[in-house]
Amino acid sequence: MTSGQSTSTPRRRRGALLPTLIILVLAIIAFVFFANVYTEVLWFNQLGFGGIFWQQNISKAIIFVAAFLVMSIAVYFSIRIAYRARPVYAPDSQVQDNLNHYQAQLEPVRKVVMIGVPIVFGVFAGAAALGQWQKVLLFLFQVPFGQTDPQFGMDISFYTNTLPFFGFLSGFLIAVVLISGIAALLTHYLYGAIRLQERGIFTSRAARVQLAVMAALFLIILGVNFFLDRFATLQNNGALRSGAMYTDVNAVIPTKAILAVAAGIVAILFIVAAVVGRWRLPVIGAAMLIITSIVAGGIYPWVIQQFQVGPSEASVEKPYIQRNIDMTRSAYGINDVEVIPYKASTTATPGALRQDATTTANIRLLDPNLMSQTFGQLEQYRPYYGFQKTLNVDRYTVDGKSQDTVIALRELNSGGIPAEQQTWYNKKLVYTHGYGVVAAYGNTATADGKPVFMQSGVPTNGKLGDDNSYQPRIYFGQSTTDYSIVGAGEGTASVELDRPQGGDNSSDSKNTFSGNGGPDVGNWFNRLAYSIKFQSTDLLLSDGVNSKSQILYDRTPVQRVQKVAPYLTIDGNPYPAIVDGKVKWIVDGYTTSNAYPYSQQQPLDSATSDSLTQRSGSGALAGSINYIRNSVKATVDAFDGSVNLYAWDDKDPILKTWQNIFPATIKPISEMSGALLSHIRYPEDLFKVQRELLGRYHVTNATEFYNNTNAWSVPNDPTTGDNTKQPPYYMSLQMPGQNAPAFSLTSNLIPQQVGANTRNVLYGYLAADADAGSTQGVKSDSYGKLRLLSLPTDTQVPGPGQVFNKFVSDPSVSSSLNLLKQGQSQVVNGNLLTLPVGDGLLYVQPVYVQSSTGGSSYPTLQKVLVAFGDKIAFAATLSAALDQLFGGDSGAVTGDKDKPTTPGTGGTGGNTGTPGENPDAKAALAKSLQDANQAIKDGQDALSKGDFTAYGTAQKKLNDAITAALAAEGKLDVTAPGSTGAPTGSAPPSTPPTAGSSTGSPTP
């Protein structure tokens, strides 16, 4: 073999290796992409929403291809035309010599550049257009609103569906023309059609024609944009009001029309220049267009605003402000709110609550924001079970009566799997699901402050059924964020850990998933695809995966609904309910828009964020809107993950549009069972947005609205100690104008904060009727009714901040709280509820006590604080506290009336007196406190010596002393007979101790 042959062989091998590696890498990338698409197809098909996947992605593909072709073809032909029209110079001319250097470098790759550059820009254009798929489909399938704007008389759908599409289209076409024009300009310059000379710029005729046409196209599109801007002024967003105001209507809108015509005229001048070969007229025209846009678009409106509107703004802007009020109220569904003047009484008279006995019977004492630890300690059973940080409030019919209920699911907690068992096999095939429903009566507690469960235990049992009446296994929930492999053939041993069994709970039963909950991974191809998707070789190779295996993923209710209905904004608080023998998650979906004319923009994050979202870690909604409807109610089966979408607001034009786009995916309300309807609630996030808007838009008079003297805001939650809003609360109550109590969602409203200070007095109380009825396929007529109690400003009803301040500063309350804080205990304040009863407004706040040490501590209900007007009371039960507050007999019926407790103490707030004489009780109280202090000292000494036995003995003595002190305190009258005292507002407040106390949910 010759030396030439020996050296050429390695070169050929190296030359063949690189293309092979490139092809291999591209093949791997292509298969990974295919695996992700293929698994998505399997997921949607299994769920019965395959049409959603294909319609959505085919639409995206068409939009991508269309944008790619328009951009790439325009750029390609722009370059090609410029290249073909290049001038030819003599070979030895100075011009040709200057160009040869650049052309020589480009020529070897010229064809690649001429094709590659358009493709690159086409890909970017397609990717950008891809994100606008919803705008395109909303335009193509739009349904009219049947309502017109007050300025142009256009249907609202023009603004929500047509105008956004045209805005996208004009912006895209401007980008196409600009990029094509720049490509042509560079090509002409490179090949000498445009060059700089001492006398100016030389352009060949071909270059002049092409660039003039490109400039004319740009100006025509710009003119269309100016014309569309006339309509866009109705979507202007101001800090205090939105829409086209006087200056917009009388200066900006006419100016936009003038600029549109001017742009068209200048475009014609550029076409003329292409023919006659003179640039003077189009250049002058372009300069005049710029000057006109500055003068007419900026200076002229400023002059009108400063000298015509400013001096008489209130009267001049009045009709336009009225437009803003009317359109905002319509867009947010608050135009039918019933405003009820409510002259609230502030005097607590005996028997005042007798007429509201049905409301007081359901006053909720269990705070769902604090009960997670309590549920966990009493009902968790195994560390691999868990409950959400924030539980839910619903209502169930128990013994023929509607009962407000705190409910949660015992979900899988993967973080609780023992460390030594954290293998792939155990995490994916063994620990697959939670088990059972836990529910407690909301209006009562046991003698020692624990929840009274109506549904509990493993196996589950109680008032709501047992394992035979509903499916208790929870495969899909808010905590199930990882995938699981389930299912097996007949005769195969079960491997899924199911639930504890046996009297001592020492063993666990096994189970095999029997539903249809996920895509099939019984064949090797599907297993390979999913092993790539989840980057797991175990999934491909494990013998635990069999021919009947299914893979469950995307398992949270919000994830599942969002994927099958990508056009919806999903409420942040799905909740579980037992419905028709199944546990189902109920999820609220919203159709929204930010293009409704004259409607006020509202950032969702600021409206939906409150102390509850902060505490639970759940995110507030994102984005900014000016139109919202709760158009869809969705359910997700907690066992098999099946999703059903129901058209809750079938009159919503945006929902109708999406139904045209994705037909047969949303079921009519007629298919909702009575059991499901009985658990439908008014959604929290919608209510939060509406209460935020009603703070200002409860005012319907334009002049009063302009003065902004009657603006309200949502108060901060006083129990958290930070500047987070008070969340709305679900409770059953009877509002003025209602014939009977109804499950409702409520919120307080106080004067709007100005600067750093605000008056925390109650100006408004908003309630939404959250009861949809229980008749199959029929929504209650009263559902969603908004009632707003408007309090007169001369009636000083304390707001939640003032009431809470009275609670913590009252001497009697403080002394009792100090007693509860003895030892290593902390006081935890529950939610501060407000109820319109007794012809006034009653505040109720449960008080919990929790150990400040140990991971197994949990809050227990110990006291109840109540307030009415300027008076407060404090007792071990709500019944006792109300009787103290209302002169010994409130007339109320309460859920804890028969609760066996140690008599509690009360404070009077409005009448702070001295304890009644009871020498034996006073002596017993003093002795108990002395024993408690000694026990604390003994415990500290024992800890310092490391004697844990002695420490345990001291803690037992401390608990006994506290129990004895509470018993002695209960025998003392809070107010001596005949004592009147001074009002709380003028009484010197004691400084509440801070050691070991908490104003919110404790951190263990």
From Swiss-Prot:
Coiled coil: none annotated. Residues 503-514 have a biased composition (Polar residues). Residues 494-517, 891-921, 974-1004 are annotated as: Disordered. It is a multi-pass membrane protein. Keywords: Cell membrane, Membrane, Transmembrane, Transmembrane helix. The keyword Nucleus does not apply. Residues 975-1004 have a biased composition (Low complexity). The chain crosses the membrane at residues 15-35, 61-81, 112-132, 165-185, 209-229, 257-277, 284-304. Residues 904-913 have a biased composition (Gly residues). It is found in: Cell membrane. One of its GO terms (cellular component) is extracellular region. Belongs to the UPF0182 family. PANTHER family: UPF0182 PROTEIN SLL1060. This is UPF0182 protein RSal33209_1243. It comes from Renibacterium salmoninarum (strain ATCC 33209 / DSM 20767 / JCM 11484 / NBRC 15589 / NCIMB 2235).
